[in-house]
Amino acid sequence: MQYPEPISKLIDSFMKLPGIGPKTAVRLAFFVLGMKEDTVLDFAKALVNAKRNLTYCSICGHITDQDPCYICEDTRRDKSVICVVQDPKDVIAMEKMKEYNGQYHVLHGAISPMDGIGPEDIKIPELLKRLQDDQVTEVILATNPNIEGEATAMYISRLLKPSGIKLSRIAHGLPVGGDLEYADEVTLSKALEGRREL
């Protein structure tokens, strides 16, 4: 169906979001058109504000509105332990359980040869640079329990094995093929408790 250009552009914009197909994009576009103008403007301002004012922490790679982020700045956190995760959403999921008190390192992806993503395309070099600090004694690999996450964890473990740093992998209380961001706090807590040394 032919829509007026402003609606077509709105539909196209929604389709750029993950998991949004043509039908959902049309529904969202018409929902937005039915909203009050001030609500739409607030929504648009929130999008622009988030894009302009958020950045990635120069230390750990977590999303933040200050650099370094609040986690890296917190002097009460254990700087001898780094938990390696794939995405900023995984940091948020780990923080929800309120049991982990170390630092994080966000890779911003996972090794995936099928998608053309190699070790140099994610933040592994930055991790290695951070580990040159003698203060770090343990690395917890909390990549997703899927093929890409496992490949990434194995690659990092092979790199770090000679360093003498204690390596562990979160336990598989998480469903294989799942993502950390969708796990509940109890499942994450059990997975962290049951991590194993590599």
From Swiss-Prot:
This is Recombination protein RecR. CDD domains: TOPRIM_recR. GO terms for biological process: DNA recombination; DNA repair. A zinc finger (C4-type) spans 57-72. PROSITE patterns: RECR, TOPRIM. It comes from Bacillus velezensis (strain DSM 23117 / BGSC 10A6 / LMG 26770 / FZB42). The lineage of its organism: Bacteria, Bacillati, Bacillota, Bacilli, Bacillales. The keyword Chaperone does not apply. May play a role in DNA repair. It seems to be involved in an RecBC-independent recombinational process of DNA repair. It may act with RecF and RecO.
